[in-house]
A protein has these predicted regions:
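Short histidine-centered catalytic/ligand-binding loop motif
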Residues: 49-52, 141-161, 206-213
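Metal-dependent nuclease catalytic regions and adjoining charged, substrate-binding loops involved
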Residues: 1, 16-17, 173-252
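Metal-dependent nuclease catalytic cores in nucleic-acid-processing enzymes
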Residues: 153-185
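A structural signal for short, well-ordered beta-strand segments and their strand-loop junctions
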Residues: 33, 121, 129-133, 182-189
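Short catalytic/ligand-binding loop motif for oxyanion handling, primarily in non-cytosolic enzymes
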Residues: 33-34, 41-43, 138-142, 193-197
Length: 252
């Protein structure tokens, strides 16, 4: 098992890359190179830990684990006319572990790609669907205060582009592990309700929405090859001219 977290050009040892590092490369190849290169070791500053979303993810996993064990459909799925069952597999806990995840050794580049899924559901034909949990606050119409429908529209919400890339990476990893994987992934949105609520009273109520997304991971292969080429270079790449981190460092 590879132990190095920084890459040395020309190394023979397989090198691990998490899903988040693939995201980093897509966002800015310069930031990625500075972060992973043994010659630089310059990481982007980290943000604060999101403890409440993490807690919601944990509780959702506990709920779906009950239905995984019983091989039953969760009521959330029934509410959305989905007859999908949480996938039961000996490695599911490892796949959901951020330090382990589902892995694939890309032999042509000697890179080990991995990522921790939130969940995986199966249909009646044992075709797998990647599932990702997202927690947020409900969006309301400013005039009527009616709750707006959750969507994956990126307009005004560019982070949702990365939601999509995230599940596409997981779809690719599962397929490379010889599972039959659907292009259709699902996002389970837990939206906290706060308008028309009299007081906190030490609790929040949530609206659950399940949104489907048809992924396309055909970009993965070329991206992996480009990642390896970047790691092997002794030159810092140009990166993304719109990268705010590079602008802050004054290196663009």
């Amino acid at each position: 098992m590879p132990k190095k977290t920084l890459y040395k050009p020309g190394q023979n040892e397989a090198f691990e890359l998490s899903r988040s590092k693939i995201d980093l490369f897509l966002q800015c190849s310069k930031c990625f190179y500075l972060d992973r290169s043994e010659n630089h070791r310059i990481a982007r500053p980290g943000g604060p830990m999101s403890y409440i979303p993490t807690a919601i993810d944990l509780l959702l996993k506990k709920e779906f684990d009950v239905h995984r064990q019983n091989e039953t459909v969760h009521p959330y799925c029934e509410d959305h006319s989905l007859s999908l069952i949480p996938f039961k597999h000996d490695d599911i806990e490892a796949w959901q572990n951020n330090r382990k995840g589902i892995r694939y050794h890309h032999e042509d580049t000697n890179l080990i790609l991995y990522g921790a899924i939130d969940d995986c559901w199966r249909d009646n034909n044992n075709v797998l669907h990647v599932v990702d949990y997202k927690s947020t606050t409900a969006s309301y119409d400013p005039k009527t205060l009616e709750i707006k429908q959750v969507s994956l529209d990126e307009k005004g919400a560019p982070h949702k582009y990365w939601y999509k890339k995230q599940v596409e990476i997981y779809q690719w990893l599962l397929s490379k592990n010889n599972f039959d994987v659907s292009n259709t992934a699902y996002f389970v949105f837990a939206s906290a309700l706060y308008k028309n609520v009299e007081a906190f009273n030490k609790k929040l109520d949530f609206k659950i929405d399940i949104i489907s997304y048809d992924g396309d991971n055909s970009w993965m292969e070329n991206t992996i090859v480009n990642i390896k080429s970047t790691l092997e270079s002794n030159n810092v790449p140009e990166g993304n001219k719109n990268c705010i981190h590079c602008k802050y460092r004054g290196v663009n």
